[in-house]
Regions:
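Compositionally biased intrinsically disordered regions enriched in Thr/Gly
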Residues: 4-159
């Protein structure tokens, strides 16, 4: 058998000083199927620092839980609109500890900002089986408006 590993990074700028890099690591090690893992980094060129929710949110805990709630709602909508999953609930599709996983979106998973808002990607196996693939959620800045700190608004160019 053979193995294959590919790495790809996509830098996308959102302003003159802030950009994010989305990296996906694809590997096939001879098993039943390959695996792809997503990573994201948000970087402020002016400060020379990686951006985290702690720097961007007025109350990081409240923001993190609010986005977890929003992910849950969007996930339910995605399941309801997928014909193969008709009649299934979140607990039928996702692992038993899905809520715990959702609440760690900002620290353990690929969360990135682009010109339109926040995107959170959970790689295959993080929320559900390989057959369900990566789970991706997007939230426009307007939906998150009440959670940003003043400095977060400035860094993201939301003023």
């Amino acid at each position: 058998f053979y193995t294959l590993s590919l790495h790809d990074a996509l830098p996308i700028y959102i302003s003159g000083s802030v950009f994010y890099v989305l990296l996906y690591d694809y590997s096939y090690l001879g098993g039943a199927h390959p695996n792809t893992v997503y990573f994201a980094w948000n970087y402020d060129l002016d400060s020379g620092m990686f951006l985290t929710i702690s720097e961007l949110a007025a109350d990081p805990q409240t923001f993190t839980l609010a986005v977890a709630d929003m992910i849950e709602v969007q996930a339910e909508e995605q399941i309801a609109s997928t014909p193969e999953l008709e009649g299934r609930s979140l607990s039928d599709v996702y692992w038993d500890n899905y809520r715990e996983t959702l609440e760690k979106w900002s620290s353990d998973y690929a969360a990135s900002f682009d010109a339109d808002g926040l995107t959170v990607i959970f790689s295959a196996y993080e929320l559900a089986s390989y057959a369900n693939g990566p789970q991706e959620f997007h939230f426009p800045y307007a939906a998150l408006d009440s959670y940003w700190s003043d400095s977060g608004r400035a860094v993201l160019g939301l003023d």
